[in-house]
Amino acid sequence: MTMRASFTRTLGCSLPILVLLTPLVLGSPAQAQRGRPSAPGTAAPVPMQPSWQSPRELERVNHDLAKAQRDLAEASFFAQRGSSPEAARLLELSRQSFAEAQKALQGGNVFAAREQAKAAENLAKAAKALYKAELGFGGPPGRSFFEAPLRAQESLSRLQAEMTFANITSGPVAELQQQAQQLLGRVNADPASYTFADYSRSKAAFHSARAALHLLAAERLSGLGSLSSF
């Protein structure tokens, strides 16, 4: 068999296969139309999912919610044994922030949900610190023990600056700012007479200010005026 005859025979055998493969390679007319602008009256292409719905962001917000829920459970445990009205109010605000976080997540705003969850976590920690001081729970003093008033003052100063910039004078943020300021005003900063109660009030002031900052961030991300609805 000559080379030309062999080539002709091979080509003849391959033609049916090429005919079958051509639509798969080139695509159907309907597939080709997908890359073109939609004509009037036709269905628009399905949009891509927003970046905030990425699995990584959802994982982060669920992690923040889990942390807030854990601190809420611990603060609620101490609330059954303590009677501090300040701690009770902080715990109430924590529950409200946690509910707002869940609401924001259901609405698709995971960034606002994360900020609300962090606010709930800090509020629960503030309540827990006050309950522990009331019930006499303490621990060995460390570096953070004596630095607590300074850290609280730094967070409070930042909060006051943010409030001035945003012109906030009422609502939960203003309430938390006043709470943090009052708690710090009751702290004895003299190292010779500094006690665990002073440390607990400093921690509560720090977490109250941090919670207010997270509420401010949630407000900016949501734009729904939620800070006046608590």
Q: Residue spans of the language-model regions?
A:
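N-terminal secretory signal peptides that target proteins for export/translocation
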Residues: 1-10
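Compositionally biased, intrinsically disordered low-complexity regions
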Residues: 9, 13-14, 69
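Bacterial N-terminal signal peptides
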Residues: 14-25
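Long, charged/polar, soluble alpha-helical segments
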Residues: 31-230
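Hydrophobic single-pass membrane-insertion segments
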Residues: 27-29
